[in-house]
């Protein structure tokens, strides 16, 4: 969101410090929904097997439908599966971490809503418009082992930004 804001209002921004780079692209969303589980197969299995077999073809819309359902007995378990999957994949320590209650619901609904709406940006919006903020200093900090936001995205952003961007990869993160 910081990047989208800076591109929309460059006159209000003096620089950016960014971490865990996510550009809101369809490949990044697909990575989260379909490919990230290669590194966390147990968490992915729980995430996907919660859905009926027929609903697994379009994981995003299946979860989105459940998460936006008014009935707590429908949206809350879906939210907890979504949030637990994400938090399980966000650590170097193996093992599922349960996220429950309003925290799970807030995280899952917000992310699914953004993902279902292409993060409210045209394809590749950030990189295509980086010229608007290229003059600003940017410090990009990225975990080398970040599975949710892989370092390749931070590299792509730093290269597109040019000389005013510094990229620091943190080896143990």
Feature annotation, model-predicted:
Residues 151-173:
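Catalytic histidine neighborhood in serine/cysteine hydrolases
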Residues 113-130:
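Active-site nucleophile elbow and catalytic-triad environment of alpha/beta-hydrolase enzymes
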Residues 61, 65-97:
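Accessory cap/linker subdomain of secreted extracellular hydrolases
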Residues 133-134, 140-142, 146:
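Short beta-strand/loop motif that positions the catalytic acidic residue
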């Amino acid at each position: 969101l910081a990047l989208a804001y800076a591109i929309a209002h460059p006159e209000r921004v003096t620089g950016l410090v960014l971490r865990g780079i996510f550009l809101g692209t369809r490949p990044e969303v697909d990575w989260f929904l379909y490919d990230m589980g290669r590194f966390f197969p147990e968490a992915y299995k729980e995430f996907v097997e919660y859905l009926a077999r027929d609903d697994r073809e379009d994981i995003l819309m299946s979860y989105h439908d459940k998460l936006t359902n008014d009935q707590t007995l429908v949206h809350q378990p879906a939210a907890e599966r979504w949030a637990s999957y994400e938090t399980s994949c966000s650590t170097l320590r193996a093992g599922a971490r349960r996220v429950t209650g309003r925290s799970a619901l807030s995280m899952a609904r917000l992310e699914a809503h953004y993902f279902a709406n292409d993060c409210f940006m045209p394809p590749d919006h950030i990189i295509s418009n980086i010229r608007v903020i290229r003059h600003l200093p940017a410090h990009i900090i990225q975990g080398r082992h970040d599975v949710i936001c892989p370092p390749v995205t931070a590299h792509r952003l730093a290269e597109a930004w040019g000389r005013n961007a510094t990229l620091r990869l943190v080896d143990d993160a």
